[in-house]
Amino acid sequence: MNSSPLPTPIYTDSYPKEFQQLLREKTENFAGRKFVFSAISDFLHSHSRGYFTIVGTPGCGKSSILAQYVSAHPRSIYYNAAVEGKNRAEDFLASVCTQLIDKYLAANGETSEIVKLKSQLQNLESHDGSWFLSLLLQQISDKLNVACETARHRQKLIIVIDSVDAIARTSQPPSTNLFYLPRYLGDRTYFILARRPFLREKSGLLIETPSQTLDLRDYPAQNREDVLNYIQQYLSTAPDLTQPEFCQQLATASENNFMYLSQMLKAIGENSHPDANLGESSLFPELPPGLAAYYQNHWLRMRGEGLSEVDLSVLKVLVQSTTGLSVSAISNIIDEDEYEIEKVLDNWIEFLNAQEIGGQICYSFYHASFREWLGKQSILE
């Protein structure tokens, strides 16, 4: 199996129907990201098995990267936990195990063994799914090992899981790996994951196999280049908007965030905002509806079951700050214990940028427009 992404053709029909429309949407106007695909390819060629994880803030393009990858590699297994109704472990196991059976074990038709496996899958309890997934992975690993003894090209089993952080943790025991992902992997078996920033001690994964993490935040120059390519490609049918200065200003306003960028470009394309002000971080007086809905989902996740007084105090400080603040600085401003502040920041880590400034880790919201949107919520007024 070729490990590098192909520009064409694009296939989505080999994946479950509930993911096909999403894959088509995420690969539309796709541009760049070669540095990510190169890293994936290098990992696959350097290791006989393993986990490769793409980490990035909301909207930075993780889902599109994975969608492009699996669309160009239809033998991959694909799952997206962010799709409505697909964030529980039992849903994941049912979908992935079915794909494994259909794509790798049922090549010769519905044999009695395949019928037996599908019957077992239908009658599995969610907590039994872990061993069944491991069983299928081992069977396929053995099959690939035998096949590659005579084949010139070494085929790999690649399972791609998007939005790992969207899992409903209540759907499985807290001591288990997210989605019951296996601790050990057989030869030629790989998982490619995408997730938002997380604390290492709360990764939800205990694995003893080769692994690598690529954090998109560590590649600002490459991200900027891809953003510019995306803008130019999107606006190629609107010559009056493709001037270099406009593209550069739009790229700067996007802060390399593709969700923000795609929504703004859509609004520009629909000419619904002729008064775009590139001097402002939000570009328009009002956010496009799609972006506002995206931020609303962030807000619901941040609020959880409710905000404490400390939560609100930290939130107000972060909303008012246009630069990063350290834990000690926040502590001095709101007169609260640093430990309590750290707990709040840890809970919101997926929506924050953390960077070292003057020897201290400073925190800010991942995008200026999200910070501004939060500042307009009634709870902060």
Feature map (PLM): residue ranges:
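Winged-helix-like regulatory helical subdomains adjacent to P-loop NTPase cores
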Residues: 25-27, 34, 280-333, 359, ...
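P-loop NTPase Walker A phosphate-binding motif
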Residues: 50-81, 98, 195-207
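Mid-core helix/loop region of P-loop NTP-binding domains shared across ATPases and GTPases
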Residues: 112-161, 184, 242, 246-253, ...
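Amphipathic alpha-helical "lid/sensor" segments that cap RecA-like P-loop NTPase cores
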Residues: 8, 200, 243-289, 312-313, ...
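C-terminal leucine-rich, beta-strand-based interaction scaffolds used for sensing/assembly
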Residues: 60, 65-68, 297, 311, ...
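Conserved small helical "lid"/interfacial subdomain of P-loop NTPases
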Residues: 216-245, 288-299, 377
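Walker A/P-loop-proximal flanking segment of P-loop NTPase domains
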Residues: 3-60, 64-69, 149-150, 170-171, ...
